Structure formats: C-alpha cells, structure tokens
From Swiss-Prot:
Record organism: Staphylococcus epidermidis (strain ATCC 12228 / FDA PCI 1200)
Biological classification of the source: Bacteria, Bacillati, Bacillota, Bacilli, Bacillales
UniProt keywords, alphabetically: Cytoplasm, Endonuclease, Exonuclease, Hydrolase, Metal-binding, Nuclease, RNA-binding, rRNA processing, Zinc
GO annotation (BP), single: rRNA processing
Protein's name according to its UniProt entry: Ribonuclease J 2
Assembly mode: Homodimer, may be a subunit of the RNA degradosome.
Length: 557
C-alpha cells in the first residue's frame, strides 16, 4: 500500500527532547515546507533542580516556524509523550493527532490547567491516513504499558520516516495492547528511509519476560501473603494495574487505590472500557479498615517518585491515610531510575524496620515497558531502515542501540547519535548532521513557565548549601549618618547563639563600609552594597569556609 504523495526535496529531523534522557520526547520532522511534531512530553525534575515541578523542551524553533507546523502527532498517553502538549498549545495553534485514549488524556490535562483554548483534535488508529500537501501520515499499533499506543509513519518519496514511540514486543498481550506486526512488515517492505526508535532498554540483553508469565508469578507470590498486601506501581502502568485487579479477583481480595495521580487517568480509561474490573472489586480507601487484612490489596500509585514517597511516609507513620503495620507485605512494581535507587533502598529499609515483608522484585515478576536488545533488533529487521536515529534514552543507551542497528545491517555512517537541537538534513544524496537549532530545557515552577533558569537554580543551591546572610542598615543621607543598624539576620548559615562574636565582627565591618561610603562626595548605593557583599563574603569564608548568599539592604529615612 503505497502512500507516497509527490516527489519531495528536503527532509530534516530535529530532536528537541528525548535524547540523552529518558523523558521529554519531542522530535520534529520537516518535509519540504511542512513541519510535524512527534510527541510533546515532559520530564520530572532531577535532584539538583530545586523547587522545579516539571521540565519541558524549549520550542523556540517551532514558535519561529509555527506557520509550517501541520500537527502534533502523539504515540501514547504517558507524560513522557503528552505532558508538554498543553504548554505547546498555549503558544502555538496546531491540531493534535492521537488514539482515542491519548486524546482523552490530553483533553483532561488541558482541563486540569484550565486552558479553554479551542483545539482541533483528531482521533486516529492503525487504519487512519492523514493527507497533507507534501506527505501522507499513517499509523501502526505498538505494545506499551498503556493501551492504544501507536507508531507514526510519514510517507515521503524517499521512503517512510518511521517513529516507533515507546514500545516492546509481547505476544501474550492482546486487544488494545497488541502490536500490528503485519502493518509493520508492510511498512518495512515498502521502504523505510529513516527509523527513529526507542533506546531505553538497549543495554538489556534478550527479551522482556512475557506479561502472562509475569502475572502467573505475581499470582504465586500474592497467594502466599497472609496479611495486608500493598502494591506500589506507577499510575501510568495500566498493564500492571490490570494484572493486580485480575489477581485480586482470583484471591477474593478487595482492591483500593491510594494516590491522587491515578484518579483522573484511571477513571477516564475505565469509562472508556480499557480496564476489565469485576463487580464490587473496588472499595474506597476509607473502607479498607472494615475488611480483614487478608481480604484487601492496596495499590499505591503516583508519578515518578510518588509511590515510593507514599511508602516511606507509611513506614514512618507520617501518612495521612494509612501506615505500615507488622505483617504487611509490600510489592514494589516499579523500575528504579538512577536517581531513585538510593531512595528506594532507604525506603525498603524503613519498611522492614516497620515490620513489613518485602516481596522480591525479580525478573519473574517484573518486566520493562520498553523493548530489550532482541526486541529492538526485531524492529530494526522488520523496518530495514536506510538511516537510523536512536532516541528515548541516555546517551549510553543510544550508543548501545546504534550498535544493535549496525549488527542488523544498517551502515555505521547512516546511524546518527544526536543531541538536542541537532539537525539531520538530506542534501539530495545523503543525510548529514551539520546544523543546530535552539534547544534546551524550560523549567516550570508552579504556574511560572520558563521563569526559572540556571541563575535561579544556582541561587537555590547556594541557599540550600550555605544559607543566607542579610545585613540591614537605615541611613540618614541628608546628615550623612547611619540612623539605625546595622542589623544582621541569617538563616541556614550558623547558629546565632554560638556565633555572636562573628556576627558582631560582621556588624562592625558593615558599619565601617557604610560610613566610608557616606564620606564620599557622591553616595553610590550600588557601590556600597557591592563592597558589603565582597568584604562580608571574605570575612565569613575565612571564619567558616562557607559562602552564604549575602543580601545587603539599605533604606533611607
């Protein structure tokens, strides 16, 4: 089934996110004068991003070329793929294409942020063909941990540009999770010019354990639990949640959810028929105490670190709703990212101290939602791309995926290891990497978008590490004298009662600096403040080897 529209001239592929990181997916494909955005995801902040809520890609390049943007094409409903859509649509008018569930989740996100902008939504499936001036766009079903996941295929005269989205191959999953192998094979046979593909598990050998085997071993583990069972998993892992529901029904246990992040997405998916839930299986969390402990399963859910934080609070008897009790069993059904490993280890220790039993999370009862090495090679062999762009992973994962591509026959010079903002362009003969566009991170803190940058983060780190030191002086400029102060305030720097001599020395230093400034023919407030910063910083560092943030405050009467 050829969907080539016309003879094309120019092709460009530009990652704005989702490279060098496992999140924030956003890839721009340009064919002649038309631009297509593939996914628009967010990333949860790293530890050093103090006070930041989420991170989205910098879309300045898209804004500057917004009249060419033909649409935002979404592969699935996870935050890594759709989390930035509402922020993009605040700045750009563009139609949104996605599966039924994905579109429903985007609409809910728009509603949650109270964005009332009229948006053109197009619900697509594996049979859909979207026709544009220069190209046609089709879709194929993929398998992920959320239903209705899609790959995107942009048909050009050079062959298709295929974006797999996040995927794995698991023939035990059916219905809304089943991959469309037949359509993938057709696309590969028609000719794939460039493949843009998920690298998250490119370092993991073999295949994922099939989900039906996972569920079988989960059943065996859960059946041995005599008391209360708490399962911790991400709200976005619909496959795992369905498995727990299935097992609970078989074990005659009621299920209750603990975690706000699940409520909206779960309820949307439930109403749309994506969950199979036996009657009377679910109970409200406030009714759990009405049942014997061996008749309930609590699913503690959330995004990123929320499930682990909830367990930690329960172990420390600090949770508002429920605490860990002697004899509870815990199953942690989440993948530990690098920055979560220490937190998870500490939490497991807290749980054991509180009297809980930990169900080991081994390969028998855990599978990734991303394809391992053999699954990635399977996709490469099906698509047989001329050019290959590994994405959706840390740089070492992209390199591992590049090696797999070379093993399956892709020429090494036609494999591109890219960073954010890199432009891969077709010059009529070869794809080359010779340009860069503006890219980076936009940090979102509360309702502020982009108003937290590196300088603000640096200040937050400084405050967190060495505290703050404030010197307040009130001046009488007319009579050139100090009217009140200096008064010293510090927070997070030193314990005042044990540092009185140092603070008195700082007061005298401030007094001397100000008095010298008042003797000048022209009083330069900015110069006085800078002298206060420099000299007080030197004094404090010599005494404490710390550099607090110094804020001089000068007022006049």
């Amino acid at each position: 089934m050829s969907l080539i529209k016309k003879k094309n001239k120019d092709i460009r592929i530009i990652p704005l996110g989702g490279v060098g990181e496992i999140a924030k997916n956003m890839y721009i494909v340009e064919v002649d004068d038309e631009m297509f955005m593939l996914d628009a995801g967010l990333m949860f902040p790293e530890d050093e991003m103090l006070g930041v809520d989420i991170v989205i890609p910098d879309i300045q390049y898209v804004i500057e070329n917004k009249e060419r943007l033909k649409g935002i094409f979404l592969t699935h409903g996870h935050e890594h793929a759709i989390g930035a859509v509402s922020y993009v649509l605040e700045q750009i008018d563009a139609p949104v294409y996605g599966s039924k569930l994905t579109i429903a989740l985007v609409k809910e996100a728009m509603k949650a942020r109270n964005i009332k902008k009229k948006v053109r939504y197009y619900t697509v499936n594996h049979d859909s063909i979207m026709r544009f001036k220069n190209v046609n766009v089709s879709f194929f079903n993929t398998t992920h941990s959320i239903p209705d996941s899609l790959g995107v295929c942009i048909h050009t005269s050079y062959g298709s540009i295929v974006y797999t989205g996040e995927f794995k191959f698991d023939q035990s999953l059916h219905g809304h999770y089943a991959p469309d192998l037949k359509r993938m094979a057709e696309i590969g046979d028609e000719g794939v010019f460039a493949l843009i593909s998920d690298s998250t598990e490119a370092e993991k050998p073999g295949y994922n354990t099939p989900e039906n085997i996972i569920e079988h071993h989960m059943y065996d583990a859960f059946a041995k639990v005599k008391g209360r069972l708490i399962v911790s998993c991400y709200a976005s892992n619909f496959v795992r949640i369905q498995q727990v529901l299935n097992i609970a029904s078989q074990l005659n246990r009621k299920v209750s959810f603990l975690g706000r992040s699940l409520e909206s997405s779960f309820n949307i998916a439930r109403k749309m028929g994506y969950f199979d839930i036996p009657k009377d299986l679910l109970i409200p969390i406030n009714e759990v105490e009405n049942y014997p402990k061996n008749e309930v399963i609590i699913i503690a859910t959330g995004m990123q670190g929320e499930p682990v934080e909830a367990l930690s609070q329960m172990a420390r008897k600090k949770h508002k709703i429920m605490n860990i009790e002697e004899g509870d069993s815990i199953f942690l059904a989440i993948t530990a990212s690098a920055n979560m490993e220490v937190i998870i280890a500490d939490t497991l220790n807290e749980l054991v101290r509180a009297g809980a039993h930990i169900i080991p999370n081994n390969k028998k009862i855990h599978a990734s939602s991303h394809g391992c090495m053999e699954e990635l090679k399977m996709m490469l062999n099906i698509m047989k791309p001329e050019y290959f762009v590994p994405v959706q992973g840390e740089f070492k994962m992209q390199i591992a995926h590049a090696k797999l591509a070379a093993e399956t026959g892709v020429a090494p010079e036609k494999i591109f290891l890219v960073e954010k903002g890199d432009v891969i362009s077709y010059n009529g003969k070869d794809m080359i990497l010779n340009e860069k566009v503006q890219s980076g991170n936009i940090l979102i803190d509360g309702i502020g978008v982009g108003d937290v940058g590196n300088i603000v983060l640096r200040d937050r780190h400084l405050l967190a590490e060495d505290g703050i030191f404030i010197a307040v002086v009130t001046l009488d400029p007319k009579n050139r004298r100090i009217a009140a102060g200096p008064e010293i305030q510090s927070r997070g720097f030193v314990y005042v009662r044990e540092s009185e001599e140092l603070l008195k020395e700082a007061e005298e230093k401030v007094r001397k600096i100000v008095e010298e400034g008042l003797q000048e023919k022209r009083i330069e407030w900015s110069e006085i403040k800078q002298n206060m910063r420099d000299q007080i910083s030197k004094l404090l560092f010599e005494s404490t080897k710390r550099r607090p943030m110094i804020i001089p405050v000068i007022s006049e009467i």
